[in-house]
């Protein structure tokens, strides 16, 4: 078992500087350069100072409007993709008023900032296990997962969240080194038993991890919402 998380050990400005350095490293990804991938990496974003929740998804696709090579500004998961935000609203993590922005067919820069500011207000940070943006929904390579897991661990250490939520088995396994059946995890939650796990030691600190189903695409959004609701009780 790891030691408890040390809260407020970094000044907020320090976190910004550390994340900027990390993001520069991400943007120099050797995998994207080797493949000639022109899509921009999708970085983490939201509340960066000990957020209540640190949500980890798998990998972004071209559907994220901030992946466009011509985009300048924030690059946060699921920008312009409405179905993910419905899951967070239905689970009680975001106010329903956010639908005025997230249900738009076409987002603009103001919409991106509206969602980013809402994440800060509610204490959420969003990121992906692999930041490389794909042209389809295919899973990332083993090599990319290994490389980006190290980056994710740095990101966690900078942000110092109170709880990590892993959406899907791939980020859960990368974070904890364990494998579980999410259906069993859900059944235990239905009986009132919430299971939490710990990250592989990140320095001297282990962070709590709560797994849930991937919320969009080939995932299980209804089951993901159900587990997230149990978590918020």
Language-model region placement:
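A polyanion-binding, active-site-adjacent surface
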Residues: 2-188, 193-195, 204-231
């Amino acid at each position: 078992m790891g030691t408890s998380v040390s809260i407020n050990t970094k000044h907020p400005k320090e976190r910004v500087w550390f994340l900027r350095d990390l993001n520069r490293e991400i943007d120099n990804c050797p995998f994207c350069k080797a493949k000639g991938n022109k899509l921009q990496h999708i970085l983490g974003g939201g509340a960066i100072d000990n957020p209540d929740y640190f949500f980890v998804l798998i990998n972004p696709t071209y559907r994220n409007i901030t992946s466009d090579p011509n985009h300048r500004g924030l690059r946060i998961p699921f920008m312009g993709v409405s179905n993910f935000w419905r899951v967070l609203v239905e689970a009680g993590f975001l106010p329903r008023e956010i639908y005025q922005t997230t249900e738009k067919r076409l987002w603009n820069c103001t919409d991106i900032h509206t969602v980013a500011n809402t994440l800060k207000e509610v204490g959420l940070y969003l990121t992906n296990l692999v930041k490389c943006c794909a042209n389809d929904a295919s899973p990332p390579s083993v090599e990319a997962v290994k490389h980006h897991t190290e980056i994710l661990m740095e990101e966690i250490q900078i942000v110092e969240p109170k709880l990590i939520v892993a959406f899907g088995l791939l980020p859960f396994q990368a974070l904890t080194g364990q494998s579980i059946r999410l259906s069993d995890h859900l059944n235990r939650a239905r009986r009132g038993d919430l299971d939490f796990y710990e990250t592989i030691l990140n320095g001297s600190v282990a962070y709590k991890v709560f797994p849930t189903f991937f919320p969009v695409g080939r995932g299980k959004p209804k089951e993901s919402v159900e587990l997230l609701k149990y978590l918020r009780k």
